[in-house]
């Protein structure tokens, strides 16, 4: 109870700090007041981009039961196994509804009728984030679509415009010795720990006397939760079936980004690219 209350405070405080907007194109769960038997399958939410703090989680989804109140579904957030190795932090994650980002865990929760969030681009996408680009590590990532097909659960893209501007990272120039060392560590850290070494920074303080901090920049954030894409239940999807439904998903992410970039006055946002 204490954690839920604390989460609500964090959410309200963040909403007061950021010019944040949430657009939900459809209700994800059954209509209010209507129960179904058997219970409906859950929904897999693909969150984009990863960014460095994944703001839509803390602003709109996790705290205070807001997601369940709006959509009638329990929410579970999938995260790397490494996060569950840290004492005390593990208890916080469990209390907030986090689960391990494994195929069995995701599929079990979808079959149980829960909404499951997954930041598909992972550590590689976080390392690629910059103010002047919006690159999603999504072109070859199809495992989440396979989970949805095996569970027969729809998939809804959640795209946040402005996420690449609120926390930035120190980017060392090509040829810099320290940059070469950190880039060499990327594959090892990503493969064995699930994250990559990044040096983040936020807004300056005291008129620039403190040139950087951990406080995010006050950039406008527009989070769009798209309409769920229905998925057939296929216990063992073929590569052709997987590719087909993955392309549907990419098209929907592109539609959301390009539509709301102009509709919400964010025309200066960089071009969306699917990489890796």
Regions found by a protein language model. Name each.
Residues 11-38:
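A short, well-structured juxtamembrane/interface segment
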Residues 20-22, 77, 272:
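Generic structural signal for residues in well-ordered beta-strands
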Residues 15-17, 70-72, 150:
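Short, well-ordered coil/turn elements that cap or connect secondary structure elements
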Residues 22-32, 62-64, 102-106, 132-133, ...:
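Eukaryotic intrinsically disordered and solvent-exposed regulatory patches
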Residues 108-276:
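Non-catalytic C-terminal accessory region of glycerolipid acyltransferases
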Residues 1-9, 37-112, 122-140, 180:
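Catalytic core of membrane glycerolipid acyltransferases/transacylases, capturing the structured
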Residues 13, 91, 146:
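Surface-exposed charge patches
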């Amino acid at each position: 109870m204490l954690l839920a209350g604390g989460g609500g405070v964090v959410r309200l405080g963040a909403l007061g700090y950021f010019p944040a907007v949430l657009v939900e194109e459809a209700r994800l769960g059954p209509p209010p007041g209507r129960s179904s038997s058997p219970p409906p399958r859950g929904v897999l939410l693909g969150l984009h981009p990863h960014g460095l703090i994944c703001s839509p989680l803390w602003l709109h989804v996790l705290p205070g039961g807001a997601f369940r109140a709006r959509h009638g579904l329990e929410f579970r957030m999938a995260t790397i196994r490494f996060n569950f190795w840290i004492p005390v932090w593990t208890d916080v994650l469990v209390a907030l509804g986090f689960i391990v980002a494994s195929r069995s865990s995701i599929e079990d929760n979808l079959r149980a009728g829960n909404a499951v969030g997954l930041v598909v681009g992972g550590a590689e996408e976080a390392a690629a984030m910059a103010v002047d680009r919006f690159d999603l590590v999504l072109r070859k990532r199809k495992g989440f679509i396979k989970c949805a097909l095996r569970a027969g659960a729809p998939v809804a893209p959640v795209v946040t415009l402005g996420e690449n501007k609120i926390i930035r990272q120190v980017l060392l120039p090509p040829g810099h010795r320290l940059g070469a060392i950190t880039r060499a560590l990327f594959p090892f850290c990503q493969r064995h720990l699930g994250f990559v070494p990044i040096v983040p920074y936020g807004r300056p303080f005291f008129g620039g006397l403190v040139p950087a901090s951990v406080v995010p920049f006050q950039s406008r954030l527009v989070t769009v939760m798209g309409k769920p894409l229905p998925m057939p239940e296929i216990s063992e999807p073929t590569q052709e079936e997987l590719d087909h439904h993955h392309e549907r998903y990419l098209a929907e992410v592109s539609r959301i980004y390009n539509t709301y970039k102009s509709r919400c006055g964010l025309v200066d946002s960089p071009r969306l690219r699917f990489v890796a």
